[in-house]
């Protein structure tokens, strides 16, 4: 962590002014903001604990975590917290205290609630969490999706799933490059499946445009982006790292979580029961006119469209440790759920 950027961002006058934009301080002044090491590592960001001392006990945070994104990353997360999260009234989203852009480096920074004493990771990546922990995650995800379900005020709120799908002119060439690199590690069945997918992709985009339940989605809601309450602590699960948020459909997050991240055996055992729990949680949260059958149909379409995901990882020059397992997992899910039948 660059000590100079911390010195700038944690200057009491500067940080206190930023916090005052998000909450009433009733004249209290921030006297000091002291950085501390925390047992957490950021992906494409630096994380540091912060102890805050105020002139008066007004209920302002005394412990927080500062996230400073690496240059060129994390920009969408700030407008999400500043303009979107406050309108959702959803406790799945961590509390946001302040944020901005460091003028010297252009790096985006956020000051958020410290979850270290109340929450923990659901498991050590890549070990899948237990079923009960996964159930807590999908129920909390449903709560978040329900908070933004079919709201009329999301028009022009930001990027959309359909915009991203339509901006896929790179897809076919990237497939050919990946297949050439993989060689005979990819069998003919996989290649044929992708050939069918590419031919039908324009039609799939139009079908996706008719999917039910438009809402805000996280975009990277794998289980290790969740923090679950520690045993004996009554808190909601928390979903972190919001730089991939956009308008879409809830099943997109679900399919990404299960079909691209879990090996076949785990997904086959957990998938249907977790979809049941997700649907029940949607209904409990007030969502209407969305049947379990409709959820299943939308989920299958989302899984099929996620054949694009490992190709996108490859096209962005991400490690084969990321895209190769995802390629295998999504092919298994497409086969198990007979998703290619949607192209007939």
Q: What annotation goes with each model-predicted range?
A:
Residues 122-127, 240, 258-264:
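Glycine- and acidic
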Residues 119-218, 227-232, 326-329, 333-343:
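ATP-dependent phospho-/nucleotidyl transfer catalytic cores
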Residues 110-117:
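Short pocket-lining segment of the protein kinase catalytic domain that shapes the ATP-binding cleft
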Residues 79, 244-286, 303-325:
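Active-site activation/catalytic loop segments of kinase-like enzymes and analogous catalytic loops
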Residues 1-41, 55-61, 204, 211, ...:
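Regulatory N- and C-terminal appendages and interdomain linkers associated
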Residues 39-57, 201-250:
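Active-site acidic catalytic loop and adjacent metal/ATP-binding pocket
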Residues 1-107, 229-237:
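Conserved NTP-binding catalytic cores of kinases and kinase-like/nucleotidyltransferase enzymes
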Residues 90-91, 148-157, 282-291:
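Surface-exposed helix-capping loop/turn segments at secondary-structure junctions
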């Amino acid at each position: 962590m660059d000590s100079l950027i911390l010195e700038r961002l944690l200057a009491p006058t500067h940080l206190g002014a930023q916090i005052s934009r998000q909450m009433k301080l009733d004249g209290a002044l921030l006297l000091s903001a002291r950085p501390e090491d925390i047992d957490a590592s950021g992906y494409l960001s630096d994380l540091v604990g912060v102890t805050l001392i105020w002139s008066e006990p007004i209920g302002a945070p005394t412990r927080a975590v500062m996230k400073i994104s690496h240059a060129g990353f994390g920009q969408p997360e700030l407008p999400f917290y500043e303009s979107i999260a406050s309108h959702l009234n959803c406790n799945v989203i961590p509390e946001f205290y302040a944020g901005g852009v460091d003028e010297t480096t252009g790096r985006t920074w956020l000051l958020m609630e410290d979850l270290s004493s109340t929450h923990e990771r659901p498991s050590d990546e890549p070990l899948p969490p237990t079923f009960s922990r996964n159930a807590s995650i999908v129920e909390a995800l449903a709560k978040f999706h329900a908070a933004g379900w079919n709201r009329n005020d999301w028009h022009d709120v930001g990027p959309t799933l359909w915009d991203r799908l339509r901006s896929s002119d790179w897809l076919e060439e990237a497939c050919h490059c990946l297949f050439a690199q993989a060689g005979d590690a990819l069998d003919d069945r996989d290649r044929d499946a992708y050939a069918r997918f590419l031919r039908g992709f324009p039609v799939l985009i139009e079908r996706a445009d008719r999917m039910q339940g438009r809402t805000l989605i996280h975009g990277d809601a794998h289980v290790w982006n969740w923090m679950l309450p520690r045993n004996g602590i009554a808190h909601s699960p928390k979903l972190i790292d919001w730089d991939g948020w956009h308008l879409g459909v809830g099943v997109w997050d679900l399919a990404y979580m299960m079909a691209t991240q879990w090996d076949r055996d785990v997904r086959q055992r957990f998938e249907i029961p977790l979809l049941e729990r997700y649907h029940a949680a949607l209904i409990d949260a007030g969502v209407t006119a969305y049947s379990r059958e409709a959820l299943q149909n939308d989920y299958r379409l989302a899984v099929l469209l996620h054949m694009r995901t490992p190709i996108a990882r490859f096209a962005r020059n991400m490690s084969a440790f990321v895209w190769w397992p995802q390629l295998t997992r999504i092919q298994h899910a497409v086969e198990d759920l007979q998703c290619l039948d949607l192209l007939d």
